[in-house]
Amino acid sequence: MSDRTIINSPEFAQAGTVLRGTLAVSEMKRLRDVLYDDAGTLEFCVQGECDARGRPRLRLAVNGVMHLRCQRCLESIAHAVDIATELRLASEAELGREIDPEEPGDIIPADVALDVGTLLEDEVLLSLPLAPHHAVGACDARPASGEGSKPGPFSALARLKKD
């Protein structure tokens, strides 16, 4: 999906349109800080529909694998992306109203020029772990050289206290 796909989200939902494709991880610029490398692609499906009350919705599904940087050892860790979410499209007037907590899914503005790539990137960012890391013991994280051999900053105080 190197060319940005722009949809009129209310019309897309009303028509029940389905958009499928792949998105290269390298195209998601806001992910660069957490990625180990930008290899791979994510498959996506965006489906428009209306709920029982006639309100437009988008169903998103994103699947694939990307390589994040482990925060323990700074090496690569494979992260499976498996997103299935529902977004209700709301007009400007609806956005100002009280939100029903029983309502499933999130609410986004109904946009006549919605960038699908940006929407998918937003969902991937929201699904990422706060601090990606390998399982305990599976990581090659080692203390920095010399760490542990240098006395702590309060060791002199501990000696004075003993005297």
Predicted regions and their residues:
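Charge-rich, low-complexity linker and terminal segments
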Residues: 1-16, 41-43, 78-163
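A positional/architectural concept
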Residues: 1-67
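Immediate flanking context of iron-sulfur cluster ligation sites
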Residues: 52-69, 122-137
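Conformational-control "hinges and anchors"
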Residues: 73
